[in-house]
Amino acid sequence: MRVWIAGIVVCAVLPLAATAATKLLPAEIQSTFFDGAEFTAATPSGIRFKMTFSADGKVRRVPTGNGGARSEGSWKLDDNGYCTTWKGGKPNCFTVVAADKNKWSVMKGPAVIATWSK
């Protein structure tokens, strides 16, 4: 009976591991996004921005619709991902997780704060 229950638990857990999202390493974030090429960011509430992270450590966001604020700041890599500091703001650090083909989730702890797409 115990073997049977253990088998069910293993079968239930294995598919979850196979679909677990892949966290990007800081170097992968830099090579994928921080090359000066513009890409799209969308917040969970639907506000969209064109984002540009330059190789020199500068970042810019421009809203593409209603809502959101245009801003500039700086970025740097850290041990787990990257950090941004917007003008007049404090540093915030994030991780990036592959979500789908050409889509990535920007995470602040367990919360998705944006979806990036190319």
Predicted regions and their residues:
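Positively charged n-region of N-terminal signal peptides that target proteins for export
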Residues: 1-4
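Bacterial N-terminal signal peptides
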Residues: 6-15
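Lipid interaction determinants
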Residues: 16-72, 76-118
